[in-house]
């Protein structure tokens, strides 16, 4: 019997796959538990529609990420932060991704998740720092951050 998996089933198939499984396994286990449904014409067309809408949604996300990359990498987009520092230019604390995300939202009205910023270590020095930002699995931008002394 051909079925369309509605969720991942270990050793059998992944969500959205169409596979041939034994009749008893499909009728007694997969279909009653909602893990699969019979692959008839209506279900096949529904799956194709879902696939098209998912692809369209991914394309929109990619376009939005590319647009945001243009804004973030613009020369005028520099996130300004201040902190207390010693005479040698080293800060008494550090600047985290949360502070950068908050400042970016306040200064440019761009809401960005702090987990998308990839800092190897917190920023502890004054001056300009380039922070890599992963906007999409295909799009990575660089955000300029300027840290000045209070």
UniProtKB/Swiss-Prot annotation:
SUPFAM superfamilies in the cross-refs: L9 N-domain-like, Ribosomal protein L9 C-domain
Keywords attached to this Swiss-Prot or TrEMBL record, sorted alphabetically, are: Ribonucleoprotein, Ribosomal protein, RNA-binding, rRNA-binding
Entry keyword Iron-sulfur: no
UniProt KW Oxidoreductase keyword? no
List GO molecular-function terms, semicolon-separated. rRNA binding; structural constituent of ribosome
What's the superkingdom here?
Answer: Bacteria
Gene3D superfamilies, per the entry: Ribosomal protein L9, C-terminal domain, Ribosomal protein L9, N-terminal domain
UniProt function note: Binds to the 23S rRNA.
Q: Which family does it belong to?
A: Belongs to the bacterial ribosomal protein bL9 family.
Q: What is this protein called?
A: Large ribosomal subunit protein bL9
Q: What is the lineage of its organism?
A: Bacteria, Bacillati, Bacillota, Bacilli, Lactobacillales
Q: Which gene encodes it?
A: rplI
